Amino acid sequence: AATTAKNIIDNSGLYLTDEQISYLLHCFGELDQMADVILVDTGAGIANHVLEFVLASPEVLVVTTPEPTSLTDSYSLLKSLYRNPKFNREYTKISVLSNRVTSAAEGRGVYDKLNTVVGQFLEGEITYAGMIPQDSALEKAIRMQKPVSLQAPLSKSARAFEVVAAELLQGESSDAYRSFGLSRLFSGFWKQKNEGVE
């Protein structure tokens, strides 16, 4: 089956008016019928709007690299998530994707580091989603601002993305997502958020 990627919302679009939220929920409702998996890229960091979006999601995929700053940012996000009273450990599946690594062993090592500190200091549990190797095709695709899967579909990084995508498709969504779909999940989240403000 062909894979299609659509850019729906970026980090600049997370500050939304009520009208924009309604439109976004309408779009999510349509996407529920079209897509098996919907990925929302919130960008790095733990700003309130990023954390709120993550809290509304049934699955969280933390993308990190071997760089110490990236690992620190990833742990900071996870710490903020686990310590937030709105976070439901039973409802949310958290996975780690090791990006731009030199080997499968390094990718697993990145996950092991995060998993150790999450277990030790947050009493949490995260799973390993896989790894994306650093290669020249990936570097070129980044410079050209094109998906490596389209730019160089036979490259190691593109094949790794296919493996990760297949795993995501085979993974079980949470009961909440299966029952209500993405639009109902986010609708409930924004309703709770607005009630908390009033």
Sequence positions of predicted segments:
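Alpha-helical scaffold segments in soluble metabolic enzymes
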Residues: 26-30, 80, 160-163, 167
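Conserved catalytic-core segment of NTP-binding enzymes
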Residues: 33, 37, 42-130
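Beta-strand-loop-alpha "switch" segments that mediate conformational coupling across diverse proteins
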Residues: 3, 121-149, 161
